[in-house]
């Protein structure tokens, strides 16, 4: 049952976050322009540890741009006044030091992942933030991947090549990938996109349970108020 599912997530051990800042994201007068289009204009935004944010707005309103800044994926982020986990960008931290705290999924990512690896290896790539695996996962890491695949109802697909999964199953695998390192900051860009009614309910329950845990921070982009 979904109640049992939620309990399993809420009961996960709390490993303590390894960054010591109350501010997870801080943008100070951030502007992003592409050519003569201004996507973000002098935006101030602070996300504190444990907060849950929903971003909604039209396509092209800058939501994905905002997420790419937070994920440290945007090439313009170095020029902007942005701090992540209490550390200002461009003060010597590597992108991997930032990413180790972040779990992320988006529809764009789905298009980038056309790799014919077994589904569990796609999930495992979330442990190291690589699209292809650089390191073979250890057995205990594989067990964690299987645990999250089970949470999303796809444990029986772990050895199936990713490209042979249905589109909805691929989405669930990429969601499992976002959760697999039990991140401090979870960034979900339209997490229910492309799912059927049953799996939308399931994923909502997983997200709700994750959000009940101590100090977990979430930013979710949605097109729909109802989500």
Segments the model singles out, each with a brief description of its role:
Residues 1-31, 102, 133-139:
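Pre-NBD coupling/linker segments of ABC/ABC-like ATPases
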């Amino acid at each position: 049952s979904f109640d049992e599912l939620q309990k399993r997530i809420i009961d996960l051990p709390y490993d303590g976050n390894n960054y010591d800042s109350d501010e997870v994201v801080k943008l100070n007068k951030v502007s992003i322009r592409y050519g003569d289009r201004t996507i973000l204009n002098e935006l101030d935004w602070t996300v504190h540890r444990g907060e849950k944010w929903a971003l909604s707005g039209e396509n092209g309103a800058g939501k994905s741009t905002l997420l790419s800044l937070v994920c440290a994926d945007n090439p313009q982020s170095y020029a902007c006044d942005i701090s992540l986990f209490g550390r200002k960008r461009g003060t010597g931290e590597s992108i991997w030091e930032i990413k180790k705290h972040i779990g992320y999924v988006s529809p764009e990512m789905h298009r980038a992942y056309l790799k014919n690896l077994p589904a569990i290896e796609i999930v495992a790539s979330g442990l190291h933030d690589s699209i292809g695996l650089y390191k073979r996962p250890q057995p205990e890491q594989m067990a964690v991947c299987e645990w999250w695949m089970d949470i999303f109802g796809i444990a029986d697909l772990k050895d199936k090549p990713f490209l042979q999964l249905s589109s909805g199953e691929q989405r669930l695998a990429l969601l499992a990938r976002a959760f697999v390192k039990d991140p401090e900051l979870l960034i979900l860009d339209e997490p229910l996109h492309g799912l059927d009614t049953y799996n939308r309910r399931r994923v909502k329950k997983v997200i709700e349970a994750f959000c009940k845990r101590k100090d977990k921070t979430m930013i979710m982009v949605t097109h729909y108020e109802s989500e």
